[in-house]
Amino acid sequence: PYEILEAIYHPIGCPPINEIIKPGQKVAFICNDPTRVANSFDFMPVLVNEMNKLGVKDEDMHIVFALGTHRPMTEEEMVEAVGKDVASRLKMYNSLCNEQEDFKYFGTTSRGTPVWINKHLCDVDHVILTGTIVHHYFSGYGGGRKAILPGCAAMETVRVNHSFMLDPAAGLGKTTGNPCY
């Protein structure tokens, strides 16, 4: 827990969590599906308890599992991912890319990508991305922002974004100019 607390109260390049989160706010956590190793069960209890200390109630937090185009997680897999304590306290949702009614439209990017994001991320004050950062063969890196796209985006958004993988600027470890990053 020390390392987790150190990371959230002394982060690199952003304010500490107690300067961002205020009492009574609503928070959504994005967690990985079983295809990505993240050990969420290690840090989610710490994050949820710290949110409580900062004045965020359990009923004002929830978890969205970033599935992208992968299969839904079972209830058992969700509990295993975040631990029994957290699973018993927070609502948990699969982000199912083919369930269009689960997404909110935000417009179209300059590259023509329609932006549909999971509705459970839209009516909160903060979205906290969890997981690991790894090299990705066309998106530059996996994890981080990829928790939102493709993780919590509708199929149409994912399909158009992934169509850019053949762009010469797409590639392993590339971020500058990479249309998929």
Model-derived segments and their meaning:
Residues 1-8:
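N-terminal amphipathic/basic leader segments beginning at the initiator methionine
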Residues 57-60, 88-89:
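Short acidic capping loops at alpha-helix termini that bridge into adjacent secondary structure
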Residues 149-181:
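Extended, low-polarity segments enriched in aliphatic/aromatic residues
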Residues 50, 137-159:
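A short, gly/pro- and small-residue-rich
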Residues 73-142:
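An acidic, phosphate/nucleotide-engaging active-site surface
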Residues 12-28, 55-58:
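Glycine-rich phosphate/diphosphate-binding loops that line cofactor/substrate pockets in enzymes
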Residues 37-56:
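Histidine-anchored nucleotide/phosphate-binding helix
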Residues 26-37, 62-68, 129:
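Short glycine-rich or small-residue beta-strand-to-loop segments that form or flank ligand, phosphate
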